[in-house]
């Protein structure tokens, strides 16, 4: 194995070597001796297990931090299709890496596109003479749904409340408003309506009485109200109190609701006028 490939291995790595073709036993022993001294755990799998069945990828799901593919024999370029690359990525831990050696030199840009579509990130090429040797990574945990606090996202809520406390602590009485001083004595006095005007229905005030020398017409209104109070409704036929169903055609109370004898009845002026 190339020395610069071994330099990319760490003591804590769990390495899976995916081999292909016919390999002699002594070659596999030499490869095992060259790699096992630099890593924590090492095991071998045949490439045909990943191409013919997907159960092998589920069996070794996330068990390796590094996959070496193409040793001792370089892998055929036509074998590294997108499906095989996806199966190998499922066997890698988050942040794991795939180190692969191909038998021929292919266009690196087109092959890097296949790596990206298969779920790998940050692929780059290593010097390999007549072979294409590259390293590709699978996304880390933080890119798979976990959250991280942004370094520039600072919360100023506590600082804002601290500033408010500092501004109000030196003189509390000066910054607070006395609610008893909002209303004056004049605000509690019941207002009087202007001469000739009435309060609203929901008002508790009393209407002002007419002046001695009233010129606004309030005196005439009060005199009319006194005359109206003295008028008592009288029915000559005795049916006027019962309603329109019992009244005569010439009854002056037609159109008014039923009433009791002695009630004060005001007939509007427009009732006595002709319609035409």
UniProtKB/Swiss-Prot annotation:
Localisation: Cytoplasm; Mitochondrion intermembrane space
Motif segment (Cx2C motif 2): 248-251
Residues that bind [2Fe-2S] cluster: 195, 211, 214, 216
SUPFAM superfamilies reported for this sequence: S-adenosyl-L-methionine-dependent methyltransferases (SSF53335)
GO CC term (a single one): mitochondrial intermembrane space
Region of interest called Fe-S binding site B, as start-end residue ranges on this chain: 237-251
Protein name: Anamorsin homolog
Protein's organism: Schistosoma japonicum
């Amino acid at each position: 194995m190339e020395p610069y490939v071994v330099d990319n291995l760490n003591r804590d790595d769990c390495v899976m070597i995916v081999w292909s073709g016919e390999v002699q036993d002594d070659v596999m022993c030499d490869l095992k001796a060259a790699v096992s001294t630099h890593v924590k755990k090492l095991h071998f799998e045949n490439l045909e297990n990943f191409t013919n069945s997907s159960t092998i990828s589920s069996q070794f799901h996330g068990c390796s931090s590094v996959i070496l593919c193409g040793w001792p024999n370089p892998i055929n370029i036509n074998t590294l299709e997108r499906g095989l690359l996806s199966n190998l990525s499922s066997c890698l831990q988050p942040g794991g890496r795939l180190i692969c050696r191909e038998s021929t030199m292919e266009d690196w840009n087109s092959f890097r596109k296949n790596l990206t579509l298969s779920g790998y990130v940050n692929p780059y090429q290593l010097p390999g003479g007549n072979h294409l040797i590259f390293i590709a990574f699978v996304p880390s945990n933080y890119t798979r749904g976990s959250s991280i606090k942004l370094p520039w996202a600072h919360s100023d809520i506590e600082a804002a409340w601290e500033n408010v406390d500092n501004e109000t602590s030196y003189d509390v009485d000066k910054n607070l408003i006395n609610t008893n001083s909002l209303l004056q004595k004049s605000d509690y006095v019941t207002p009087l309506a202007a001469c000739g005007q009435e309060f609203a229905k929901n008002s508790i005030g009393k209407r002002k009485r007419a002046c001695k020398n009233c010129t606004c017409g309030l005196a005439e209104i009060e005199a009319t109200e006194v005359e109206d109070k003295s008028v008592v409704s009288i029915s000559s036929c005795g049916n006027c109190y019962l309603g329109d169903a019992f009244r005569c055609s010439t009854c002056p109370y037609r159109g008014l609701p039923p009433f009791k004898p002695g009630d004060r009845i005001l007939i509007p002026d427009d009732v006595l006028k002709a319609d035409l």
